[in-house]
């Protein structure tokens, strides 16, 4: 589809790129702090019905704190955090980061993606909201979707520590600075730690985007993600379904830099590019 505007109209699950925003929600609501650790066995069991939500790394990440959960992209950590979250507060928080709304003043017919809520699910699917829906939202999967432009906006929002002008392709002399309430409640030290953790995604030997370290000569903050198109239980199952190119996961990343004073923020989606 060469004439389809994927940047403004393509919908993709944000996947693990959402984790810095979820982390800041947990900090803001005092559900966790930076030293809060869990034992990650590679899965999370939903207490209500014993349903198992699996992480991407078999065997898990062991004992892991918030910073390393971002660097290593621990699904179990964020499953656990999302489970403790109030869905209405969480969706309001994510809306401030650009999800589920039009953030581009001069894009042609932009898609706003989907930021799911209990009200949306009842109105569109005629089902109530389950705690498992919130758990999925914690890792950017499930019903949620976003456009690459929204992801770039989100990346810039993180880079600017919650201060951002309305996205526009035309340079304006007088730009209105926007600082949503949720961002104003986040401390400077927490923004610094988010940046440090996202730098670790590339710089730390355990970072999920460590392969990019050899390709650059400056420091960049990033968060990678894998958009699952077909749900599978094991790597062996995935090897079978990936024989069809259209079943392969999308690769996704947000980034900003050069650090510590970023000038550029980007998002990249590689369809069926895998992790």
Predicted stretch roles:
Residues 1-16, 21-270:
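Beta-lactam-recognizing serine transpeptidase/beta-lactamase-like catalytic domain environment
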Residues 272-275:
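Short, intrinsically disordered, charge-balanced linker/junction segments flanking boundaries
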């Amino acid at each position: 589809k060469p004439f389809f505007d994927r940047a403004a109209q393509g919908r993709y699950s944000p996947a693990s790129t959402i984790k810095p925003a979820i982390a800041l929600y947990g900090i803001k609501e005092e559900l966790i702090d930076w030293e809060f650790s869990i034992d990650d066995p590679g899965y999370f069991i939903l207490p209500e019905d014993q349903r198992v939500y699996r992480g991407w790394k078999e065997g898990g990440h062991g004992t892991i704190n918030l910073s390393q959960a971002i660097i290593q992209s621990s699904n179990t950590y964020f499953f656990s955090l999302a489970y403790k979250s109030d869905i209405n507060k969480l969706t309001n928080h994510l809306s401030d980061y650009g999800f589920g709304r039009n953030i581009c003043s001069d894009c042609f017919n932009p898609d706003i993606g989907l930021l799911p809520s209990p009200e949306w699910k009842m109105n569109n699917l005629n089902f109530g909201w389950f705690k498992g829906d919130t758990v999925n939202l914690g890792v950017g999967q499930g019903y949620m979707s976003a456009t690459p432009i929204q992801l770039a906006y989100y990346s810039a929002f993180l880079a600017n520590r919650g201060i951002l002008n309305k996205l526009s392709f035309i340079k304006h002399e007088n730009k209105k600075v926007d600082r949503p309430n949720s961002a104003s409640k986040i401390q400077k030290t927490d923004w610094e730690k988010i940046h440090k953790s996202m730098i670790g995604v590339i710089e730390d030997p355990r970072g999920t985007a460590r392969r990019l370290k050899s390709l650059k000569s400056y420091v960049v903050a990033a968060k990678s993600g894998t958009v699952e198109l077909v749900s599978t239980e094991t790597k062996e199952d995935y090897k079978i379904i990936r024989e069809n190119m259209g079943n392969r996961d999308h690769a996704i990343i947000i980034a900003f830099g050069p650090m510590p004073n970023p000038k550029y923020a980007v998002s990249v989606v590689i369809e069926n590019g895998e992790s």
